[in-house]
A protein has these predicted regions:
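Start-of-helix register in tetratricopeptide repeats
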Residues: 22, 55-58, 92
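Register position in tetratricopeptide repeats
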Residues: 33, 69, 102-103
Length: 103
């Protein structure tokens, strides 16, 4: 897909409609696909700022992955430990934590 176009559509939506956790998550995923990890991180974090959104678990996990791609393994591990306290049954996160412990 054309991630540049998708990113511009999502940014345009946000500028007109205001904050939306689902759109921030999709924007972050587009930025990850473009290897724009700092932009992805900013999108995931913006989504997390929206109170009561239904994507908090997804946004938190994606934030951790963005930190990994930025090679900030220490911050990723701190966030992963907090994530697993909130979502202890997430098997993908448990495997990811094992990966982080080797960094």
């Amino acid at each position: 897909g054309d991630y540049n176009y998708a990113s511009s559509v999502y940014n345009n939506y946000l500028s007109k409609q205001g904050p939306n956790a689902e759109i921030y998550n999709e924007l972050g995923l587009c930025e990850m696909a473009k290897k724009e990890y700092q932009n992805a991180l900013a999108a995931f974090q913006a989504g997390k700022q929206i109170e009561g959104n239904s994507l908090m678990q997804t946004l938190c996990f994606n934030e951790i992955v963005a930190y990994e791609y930025l090679e900030d393994y220490q911050q990723a591990e701190v966030l992963m430990n907090a994530y697993l306290q909130n979502y202890p049954d997430d098997q993908t996160a448990i495997r990811e934590q094992q990966f982080l412990s080797t960094r």
